[in-house]
Amino acid sequence: MIDEIEQGIDGTELKAGIIAEIGSSEGKITPLEEKVFIAAALAHNQTGRPISTHTSFSTMGLEQLALLQAQGVDLSRVTVGHCDLKDNLDNILKMIDLGAYVQFDTIGKNSYYPDEKRIAMLHALRDRGLLNRVMLSMDITRRSHLKANGGYGYDFLLTTFIPQLRQSGFSQADVDVMLRENPSQFFQ
């Protein structure tokens, strides 16, 4: 990881700007996954690069943060992915309280969790003044997600979900915090 940050990826001059996506299994962190988290923490501590994690079905985010924190990682430099796949507000609030960012990044995957419920959780976070710790994105992971194959496509977040947020009472400033300002701050 450190070599890809400092020297370049696969012999190129392209250098990694983030340590990602390190993940855990549903409901547990296996010994091998723990090794990867420790390696990511070492790379972060040496390079200062931010870390992005993967949770399986919105589980183990708090445990991921505890593991990284035990290795000396500044949790304000960590974003926990896939926090929006179930009713998870209590854990999201705890992760934010620890200083981490949370990602609502499976937008459009209504077969896992409906966007209406994602919007309700975002309202709860906005009402608490916590949008400054939330990032929005999409997890396009299969060809079936592409428009050419009948999926919702890469533009769904901007053309469908953001208008739904706006109609539900979010301001453009709220949206900009989650789409622009937070990612910019995270990468500084």
How would you describe each model-predicted region?
Residues 156-188:
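Mid-to-C-terminal alpha-helical segments outside catalytic/metal-binding sites
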Residues 1-45, 101, 106-111:
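Active-site gating/metal-coordination segments in enzymes
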Residues 80-86, 105-123:
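Active-site glycine- and acidic-residue-rich loops that bind
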Residues 30-34, 58-72, 89-96:
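Distinct, well-ordered alpha-helical segments
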Residues 50-56, 77-85:
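Catalytic beta/alpha-barrel core
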Residues 47-50, 69-77, 94-103, 132:
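Glycine-enriched alpha-helix->loop->beta-strand junction motifs that scaffold or abut catalytic
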Residues 105-106, 130-151:
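Short acidic/histidine-rich active-site segments
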